[in-house]
Amino acid sequence: MSKTNNKTDSKTANTNNEAKIALHGVTKTFGSSNRVLQGVDLEVKKGKSLVIIGGSGTGKSVTLKCVLGLIHPDSGSIKIDGQETVGISANERDALMRKFGMLFQGAALFDSLKVWENVAFGLIQGRGMNRKEAYDIAMEKIEAVGLRPEVGHQLPAELSGGMQKRVGLARAIAANPEIIFFDEPTTGLDPIMADVINNLIVKCVKNLGATALSITHDMASVRKIADEVAMIYEGKIIWHGAVKDLDHSGNPYVDQFIHGRAEGPITKNEPTPLKKAS
């Protein structure tokens, strides 16, 4: 009996540790010489939230777009649930996208649509759901992100930036996705509203049992929403570990970045000073 239980426990543990998203040797070059990704290796475990950090131009956004299928990598493998996604057909890509939810850097709302219609957009247009059913789901999600029901009948222009971000989050979770992507989710928000959004992200991801992949410069957001953190530098993942180990990474690049220090191995090109008029 004990032997059987051990096997069951082992199987359960393996299932929980399965990679929901797996990138191996992913490269991408733009033009003839701008090699942005130089062999990205990264795994996101099922049900975990991983945040990619790194400076501007290091490859964060390109990595995210490759996973989403918005950019085609030059080489390497990108698997979702063990299925290779590089080079799949349009129909296979459409089926895969049904697993995804996305909160964009800007809320990316349609100005001419009411809030509930924005939240329900993917349900109606992407899944062919009737408007009544989509409306009910949209209103449920609007309340789930802390907005009053009447907000659902307003236009995006009538909302503050923080409220628009909540609407974007409601849209991201409308179809109960298996994987949610967050692109700089707190950009443009004051510290208090940023923390509100971070708390909502944690709650929504947990309630859905979803896997999350995010990119951000906001270290307060990283510490709040991440289970694991990966740092990308010059197109490669140079550190990957638990968020609790971030301050003790032993990596000078990570240490410099998370503390925002000018001095360190990461160098920034300073602008050439303007010459004084003679």
Where are these predicted regions, by residue range?
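Conserved ABC ATPase "signature" region
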Residues: 83-84, 132-150
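Helix-to-loop junction immediately C-terminal to a conserved catalytic motif
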Residues: 68
